[in-house]
Amino acid sequence: MRIIFMGTPDFAVPSLKAIAAMDGDFEVQLVVTGKDKPRRSKRSEPEPTPVKKAARELGIPVMEVDDVKDERFVDTVARYRPDVLVVAAFRILPPAVYEQARLGAFNLHASILPRYRGAAPVNWAIINGERESGVTTFFLRKSVDTGNMILQEKTPVYPEENAGELAARLAEIGAGAVVKTLELIRDGRVEPLLQNDTLATRAPKLSTENTRIDWVQPVDALCDFIRGLAPRPAAWAIFNHKKVKIFKASVADFHQPEAEEQSAIPGRIAVENNRLFVMGLDGWIEILSLQMEGKKVMQSHEFCCGFRCDEECPVFS
């Protein structure tokens, strides 16, 4: 089976390696990935994508693509005469590309479809307090993340797990699902399942606007929001007119009666015994790890040691 693999970030690497380790019935003829990223230093070589690095180690030819609609790219895919296209965390492909695959093109998506269709399924699952996540393989179609499903694998979302940790686990689970999917296609045993669009939910791309913390939330929701965006891009707020990223927090058994009675303002800060607390809608959370604008990531006790505020009632806004 001739395979073209398409992917860019770390999430896609376990799947590529798993396919490369399969028996002789499966051959990855080409890996397609994004362009190298420029480094901060102009003298340094551009940074290859994680998938490109893995493909080089495996000795598989690599093609970097900027525009998936470019006719030269479409022609290249056609010349390889692929039986299957495997896509994991790549771009939205036009039909002219994925229809080249004789037996079909499928995508690995990090959610239990039809829930969390979109660019950031892992993040939004945690933000919304889901207790279960997983992966789905499905055949590509023009409408994004709506194709007929092939295989699903489910896993719990652990209470303290952040988005980066869950994504790493799903990448490994997904690699197994990709292998099983290829075997089903080879053996002609695929039984595609239609998605129920009435159950669909969205997982939109993360932005500056939708990653800012709204402190007028229950404390459980605040902690879910923070871990759902950790370690990247990170939930953020404003303190002393500067941006602060918050990476880790927990619900706190903390009370400050005077503050709660006089200034029950969500976002209010309290420092006690070098611990940093922030008021939510129904209690307090403890901030454990954060980063002030222009500074390195620090633990909360480091922040508390140098705590200064321009306001009488300090708040994260």
From Swiss-Prot:
This is Methionyl-tRNA formyltransferase. Gene3D superfamilies: 3.40.50.12230. It catalyses: L-methionyl-tRNA(fMet) + (6R)-10-formyltetrahydrofolate = N-formyl-L-methionyl-tRNA(fMet) + (6S)-5,6,7,8-tetrahydrofolate + H(+). Keywords: Protein biosynthesis, Transferase. HAMAP family: Formyl_trans. Attaches a formyl group to the free amino group of methionyl-tRNA(fMet). The formyl group appears to play a dual role in the initiator identity of N-formylmethionyl-tRNA by promoting its recognition by IF2 and preventing the misappropriation of this tRNA by the elongation apparatus. Belongs to the Fmt family. (6S)-5,6,7,8-tetrahydrofolate binds at S111, I112, L113, P114. SUPFAM superfamilies: FMT C-terminal domain-like (SSF50486), Formyltransferase (SSF53328). Signal peptide: none annotated. GO terms for cellular component: cytosol.
